[in-house]
Amino acid sequence: MRISSSPSPALGSIVNQPTSGELAAETPLAKASLTQSGAGGGQAFVQFGQANDSPSSFSGTEQSGSSLMSLLTRSSSSESTSSVDQDSDQVSPMTSVSSTASASPTAASNPANAPSATDAAFLDNSEYSSPEALKRWEPMVANLPPEEREQAAKELNRPIAAAWMARENGPNAEKAMAFINANPALKTAVDVGKDGGNADGKITNKDLKAFAKNMEKAADNADKDVAKYMEDNPGADPQSLEMVRSAAVMRANMPLATAADPHHAVGAADKTDVDGNVSAEGLKALIKSNPGLSGTLKQSSNMWSQAGFLSQVDEAGLTGRKKAAHSPDQVFDASNMSEWIRKSAPKNGGQFASMLSDAATLNSVAGIDISKLNAQVFEKPKAYTGAQKAAVMIKLQQTQQSVIAGRDLRNTEKTEAGLNERIAQLQADPDVQEYLNKSIPEQERSLVRSDSALQKAVTEQAQNVNSGKALQTDLATADKAVDKHNPDPDYSGAITGLSAQLQLQKDLFPDAQVPTAQQVFNNQPDEVQTKIADSYVRNFSEGGALKQLLGQKKSDAGESLQTADNQKAAYESVLPADFVNGERESYTASTLSELQNSKKGRKLLEGKTDEEGALRWPSSSPSKVSEARRIQFGHGLRVSV
């Protein structure tokens, strides 16, 4: 990451800029609350009530994996991919090195004379690729069939094996150096192994040793990151696990990735130093110009070179004044990747759906220049394209999330009001709606297709969602979150996650019959349906949810009431209408009781009752407002058509 205090030129003329005191993020990008109320009751990032499940003629709860995969991989000439660089071909995790003829050591620096797969066998079968040495790669190849894992680990280990072997005397050292020279990213990475910075073309034994040690340390740190994630999220879905695995591959290869940009190489025009940052340009060069490197690494590079994914890692781990000083710059470093795995990676299918929608939204506006736009965008909106206005909206929403995160530092009310007004205008703009409703599904499909392993995981999860297996897993996770302060499990996150994943299916598989959330619920065993209904009674008919929310430190009664209503709406999206109607009076009575029993609640009641003394519900309650999808970056939402 590069640190810059210079805001986007466009923003200064569009809305008053927040001060550094307002810009402080305590939560990752997709977790920031981007609504004025700041309330949200679900575990997933999608706010219920803004994504509707339209009825379909779904005839069963499962689609075959092969048919879904076929729908996902089907090429579509009508899809626009102008905002995503499509030069990078799909890379198989088991891609072998180039099959060109064996090169002599003196010609090995020419990529056209790259070592073949059989040439690399001297590394794969050496003492430097022993079972003990390969253990560090096990978490990164665990997704592969058992018979493929050892070879994939050997390919990932090649840079380390080559560096150690090149320090020997004799023919093996020459072969190892030929391999290093044939792979430009590896050559530059070894060149700067000891002292970093400038590649001078002089590779010493100290450089070789330092590089090998750096790679081993990076891989070991990646293992720790994955282990921590697995410990914290034992019920993570296949898609989220695949994202974490891919991120771990990148984390383990950071010494290579940071050196992959062609501008870092000896003799490059406009030569730059290796500075610990990774860019999309560097990742694309790693894929295209390094025939001896692992196919698994290239597949990971292909994924993280996508603008939407790269942007999410760019700011991972930044908080407080570091966040305030940082402008998104489309580069990341090792600490960003570790922080993303440990703290920002999705933990369930609903969070994955939100993350993918956010990434697709960013992809949709990547490369759209708004640096010369100003307030005319709002005063004369017809003069600008939907793409331009969408790019401005996303930029404002990114600013908005930082401002909201800085509420504890100062009063941000005026700044938020200005942002909210501008964002609302763009959200309601038909051109913006039309552009994003077309481009986001296209970009979601493009992002999933960028990695064949992710594609497989998405198809597997779709089957889990439609069968109800994913819902049951998320319900079990919610049960484990119960403690003395929160004695009643909250299943609203599991239900909103279900809705988010079904919406994602509609985007990814436009020709498939996708069930509604209520259809999935109705196909669950009686004990699952009863479990959710009983939870509704405890949380809403008996007031448990509101009681827990009001009991939290620094809780606001109005926001607590809104959050409880959001949670209630999630349950009601799947429960039978006659059951919900039968609980309505109990809900009203318990809500009034909990508010009256709380000092915060009593204060709220003074301003929230009408002349007859009846409680007046928040006007933005999902139970009362339209369920149309809104464009809201950070929650995976957009306007439906």
Swiss-Prot record:
<feature type="compositionally biased region" description="Basic and acidic residues">
    <location>
        <begin position="603"/>
        <end position="614"/>
    </location>
</feature>
<dbReference type="InterPro" id="IPR031613">
    <property type="entry name" value="HrpK"/>
</dbReference>
<dbReference type="Pfam" id="PF16937">
    <property type="entry name" value="T3SS_HrpK1"/>
</dbReference>
<feature type="compositionally biased region" description="Low complexity">
    <location>
        <begin position="44"/>
        <end position="121"/>
    </location>
</feature>
<feature type="region of interest" description="Disordered">
    <location>
        <begin position="1"/>
        <end position="127"/>
    </location>
</feature>
<feature type="compositionally biased region" description="Polar residues">
    <location>
        <begin position="1"/>
        <end position="20"/>
    </location>
</feature>
<feature type="region of interest" description="Disordered">
    <location>
        <begin position="598"/>
        <end position="628"/>
    </location>
</feature>
<protein>
    <recommendedName>
        <fullName>Pathogenicity locus protein HrpK</fullName>
    </recommendedName>
</protein>
